[in-house]
Amino acid sequence: MLIELNSANHSEVLETDKPLVLEFYSPTCVHCKKTEAGLAENAESDDVVVAKCDITAEPALAEQYDVTALPTLLFIKNGEIKERLVGFTHKLIIAENIKKINSIAP
């Protein structure tokens, strides 16, 4: 499942009982576009929720999560950030981190 995160649905998305991968991106960022391909593949899994947030449309959310470079991927479980990756991230690294946060006890 791939969700476009914004200030209106932010709280609802974070309340998921599944692990969450949150990408902060900009539509003009080349590395963001490369990372999104891997995110889309991993979003097909029922084991995780994948959300992306356009920092040009939602700068307050980017600031709230201390995003200073793009793309930034946050791996969240039970509302807590378990991992932060900055820069282009290959789909296999995304999958490994999803597996890692899925193995963390609730």
Regions found by a protein language model. Give the residues of each.
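Typically the conserved alpha-helix immediately C-terminal to a functionally engaged Cys/Sec
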Residues: 31-45
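Thiol-based oxidoreductase modules, predominantly thioredoxin-like and allied folds used
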Residues: 4-5, 24, 43, 47-60
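The canonical Cys-X-X-Cys-His
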Residues: 29-32, 73
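Short active-site neighborhood of thiol/selenol oxidoreductases, capturing the structured segment around
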Residues: 15-27
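Short loop/turn elements that flank and shape the SAM/SAH-binding pocket of Class I
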Residues: 12, 58-60, 92
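Structural micro-motif
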Residues: 65-74
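Non-catalytic, surface beta->alpha helical segment in thiol-disulfide oxidoreductase systems
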Residues: 77-106
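N-terminal "domain-start" segment that seeds a small globular fold
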Residues: 1-12
